[in-house]
C-alpha cells in the first residue's frame, strides 16, 4: 500500500550554488576560465610528454597519466556545473547520477594510488639513482598504472553497490551542484545512517591509507638522504616539494571533510569546488613550474604549434 502511494523518482534536482544572477555570472566566468585552463594545461603536458623523445622517462610517463586523470576528473563535474548555472531547473537523471558517481570515485581512487607510484619513483630516483632505469622499467610503470586503475574502479564499484538498488520516492532535491554520494543516499526511501557510514568509511579508508603511505614515503626518503649526506637533504626536499604540494591539494579537502566535526552545506560546496575545478589546474602548474626540462619542452611544443598555425 505504501509503495502505491509513492512515485519512484527518475531524476534529481540540483539546488546549485546561488540564485543571484550577478553571482551566477561571476561563477560562470570563474569556472569557465579554470576549466579551460585545466584542459589546456593538462593536454599540453600529455602532448609534450608523448611527442618529445627527451621526456621518455618513468617520471614523465606517470606525470602524463596524472594529467589524463585530471582531465577526466574535472570533466566529470565541471561541464554540467557550468551548463546548469543559468538554468532554472538543474536536473540530472538517476542513470546520469550513477555515471557521475562512478567516474568521480574511480578517477579519484586511481589518482591517489598513482600518487603513491610517483612517490616510489622519486624514492628510486633520489635514493637509488644508479638503478633507476632498471627498477622503473617500462613494464613496471605500466603495472603501476594498471594497478592504480584497478584499485580505483574497485573502489568505485563498491560505492555504487550500495546505491544502485536503492528506491527513491521523494524528495529529489540535492543541495549540491553534482551527485554528491552521501547527500544522494540520504534521499532514499529507507533509513540510510548505516549505509552512509559504510560509504564514508570506504572513501575515508582509501583516502587516509593513501595519505599515510605518501607521508611515510616522503619522510623515509628524507631520512635516507640525511644518513648519506647532510647537504643532500636540501636537494631531495627540492625534488619532492612539488609532490608534497600536490598531495596536500588532493588530500587536504578530503581530510578536512572527514575530520571536521560540524560540516555545513557551504563548506562542503567550497571543498567540492576546490577539488573539482581548482586542483586540476594547479597540478600541472606545480609539476612544471620548477621543472626546467619540462618548461623548455612545453615552450618548444607551443612554438611548433604557432608555426604550424601560421602555415594555414
Curated annotation (Swiss-Prot):
It is a multi-pass membrane protein. GO terms for cellular component: plasma membrane. This is Olfactory receptor 4F6. Its main location: membrane. Residues 50-57, 121-139, 220-235, 290-312 are cytoplasmic. Glycans are attached at residue 5. It is found in: Cell membrane. PANTHER family: OLFACTORY RECEPTOR. Belongs to the G-protein coupled receptor 1 family. It comes from Homo sapiens. GO terms for molecular function: G protein-coupled receptor activity; olfactory receptor activity. Residues 1-25, 80-100, 159-195, 259-269 are extracellular. SUPFAM superfamilies: Family A G protein-coupled receptor-like. The chain crosses the membrane at residues 26-49, 58-79, 101-120, 140-158, 196-219, 236-258, 270-289. InterPro entries: GPCR_Rhodpsn, GPCR_Rhodpsn_7TM, Olfact_rcpt, Olfactory_Receptors. Disulfide bonds join 97-189. Keywords: Cell membrane, Disulfide bond, G-protein coupled receptor, Glycoprotein, Membrane, Olfaction, Receptor, Sensory transduction, Transducer, Transmembrane, Transmembrane helix.
Amino acid at each position: 500500500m505504501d509503495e502505491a502511494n509513492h512515485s519512484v523518482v527518475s531524476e534529481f534536482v540540483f539546488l546549485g550554488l546561488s540564485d543571484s544572477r550577478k553571482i551566477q555570472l561571476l561563477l560562470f566566468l570563474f569556472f569557465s576560465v579554470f576549466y579551460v585552463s585545466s584542459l589546456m594545461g593538462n593536454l599540453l603536458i600529455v602532448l609534450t610528454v608523448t611527442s618529445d623523445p627527451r621526456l621518455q622517462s618513468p617520471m614523465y610517463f606517470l606525470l602524463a597519466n596524472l594529467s589524463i586523470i585530471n582531465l577526466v576528473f574535472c570533466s566529470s563535474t565541471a561541464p554540467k556545473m557550468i551548463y546548469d548555472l543559468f538554468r532554472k531547473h538543474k536536473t540530472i537523471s538517476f542513470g546520469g547520477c550513477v555515471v557521475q558517481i562512478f567516474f568521480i570515485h574511480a578517477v579519484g581512487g586511481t589518482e591517489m594510488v598513482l600518487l603513491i607510484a610517483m612517490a616510489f619513483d622519486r624514492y628510486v630516483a633520489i635514493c637509488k639513482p644508479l638503478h633507476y632505469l632498471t627498477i622503473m622499467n617500462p613494464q613496471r610503470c605500466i603495472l603501476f598504472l594498471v594497478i592504480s586503475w584497478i584499485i580505483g574502479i574497485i573502489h568505485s564499484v563498491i560505492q555504487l553497490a550500495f546505491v544502485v538498488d536503492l528506491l527513491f520516492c521523494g524528495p529529489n532535491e540535492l543541495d549540491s551542484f553534482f551527485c554528491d554520494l552521501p547527500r544522494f543516499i540520504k534521499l532514499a526511501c529507507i533509513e540510510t545512517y548505516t549505509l552512509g557510514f559504510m560509504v564514508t568509511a570506504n572513501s575515508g579508508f582509501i583516502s587516509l591509507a593513501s595519505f599515510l603511505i605518501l607521508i611515510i614515503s616522503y619522510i623515509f626518503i628524507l631520512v635516507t638522504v640525511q644518513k648519506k649526506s647532510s647537504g643532500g637533504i636540501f636537494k631531495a626536499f627540492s625534488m619532492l616539494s612539488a609532490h608534497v604540494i600536490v598531495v596536500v591539494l588532493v588530500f587536504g579537502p578530503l581530510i578536512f571533510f572527514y575530520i571536521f566535526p560540524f560540516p555545513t552545506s557551504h563548506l562542503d560546496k567550497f571543498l567540492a569546488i576546490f577539488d573539482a575545478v581548482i586542483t586540476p589546474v594547479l597540478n600541472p602548474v606545480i609539476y612544471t613550474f620548477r621543472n626546467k626540462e619540462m618548461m623548455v619542452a612545453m615552450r618548444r611544443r607551443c612554438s611548433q604549434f604557432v608555426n604550424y598555425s601560421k602555415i594555414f
